[in-house]
A protein has these predicted regions:
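Active-site-proximal cofactor/substrate-binding loop regions of enzyme domains
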Residues: 75-79, 83-88, 100-114, 118-134
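Hydrophobic/aromatic-rich core segments of domains that either
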Residues: 118-207
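Active-site-proximal structural scaffolding
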Residues: 56, 73, 77, 109, ...
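Amphipathic hydrophobic-ligand
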Residues: 212-216
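Hydrophobic alpha-helical scaffolding
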Residues: 49-53, 66, 70, 95, ...
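Extended non-catalytic domains of envelope/secretory-pathway proteins
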Residues: 51-57, 102, 128-131, 173
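Short, conserved phosphate-binding/catalytic loop or strand-edge motifs used
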Residues: 61, 96-103, 140-145
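Secretory-pathway-linked proteins and extracytosolic
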Residues: 1-93, 97-98
């Protein structure tokens, strides 16, 4: 085994300015590449980490609540999204394995809070229980200056959402945004590449950049 030591002297303190891009775009930094061959290899690891018990003891009650007032399957998807947004508080506690492995859906419901991985897994579980094609999705926000294809490491992916395909169209659901409705995409992931679960692997999708009126 080899040990590499990097020593830097006389570095100036980065200046943070309002409206400036994230530090990764402007500040020199070391990037540990890791051992993944490509984004498929990295997603396989992520999917394995997300392979937890998805049993929800009171699932029938939750689904009955979600179905109330829904007149179409699309409204059921919207209600499911809204249920997770309103019942689960976004709180990222990332220490040890929890930085990469989501809590079980049952535990997330019990605690009433979860990080992006836990919330997206709960959303995926509830949608799949209703027969929808919901999939795990790993993505890097606009804070990251490189894509998972360019740099297949966990440094290029810092967020998790759920993608549901309905009538041939992908809907990107980020439940960490408490009030965003179905069909809208948070600004920080618009135009970003996402690794969307497909069979045993993943497919790379580029999220759309919405017009200004759809972001207000």
């Amino acid at each position: 085994d080899s040990v590499f030591t990097y020593v830097m002297h006389g570095l100036s303190v980065p200046v943070s300015e309002e409206g400036a891009p994230a530090w990764g775009y402007t500040v020199p930094h070391l990037l540990v590449i890791g051992s993944f061959k490509d984004e498929q290899d990295m997603f396989a690891w992520s999917k394995k980490m997300a392979d937890v018990d998805c049993t929800i003891p009171n699932q029938a009650e939750i689904l009955a609540e979600i179905a109330q007032g829904a007149k179409s399957d699309k409204e059921k998807i919207a209600n499911t999204f809204a249920w997770v947004q309103s019942h689960i508080r976004y709180l990222a506690y990332e220490a040890g394995v929890s930085a990469h492995q989501p809590a079980t859906p049952a535990e997330t419901i019990r605690k009433r809070y979860g990080d992006c991985k836990a919330m997206s897994l709960l959303l995926k579980t509830l949608l799949k229980a209703q027969g929808f094609d919901a999939r795990q999705t790993d993505i890097g926000t606009d804070d990251i200056p490189y894509t998972s294809h360019e740099v297949p490491t966990i440094s290029s992916v810092n967020h998790a959402i759920c993608t549901v395909f309905y009538q041939g169209k992908p809907y990107y659901l980020d439940a960490t945004n408490s009030y965003i409705p179905l069909g809208y995409i948070p600004t920080n992931i618009q135009g970003r590449q996402a690794l969307v679960e497909e069979g045993e692997g993943c497919r790379v999708y580029t999220l759309p950049t919405l017009p200004l009126e759809a972001c207000s």
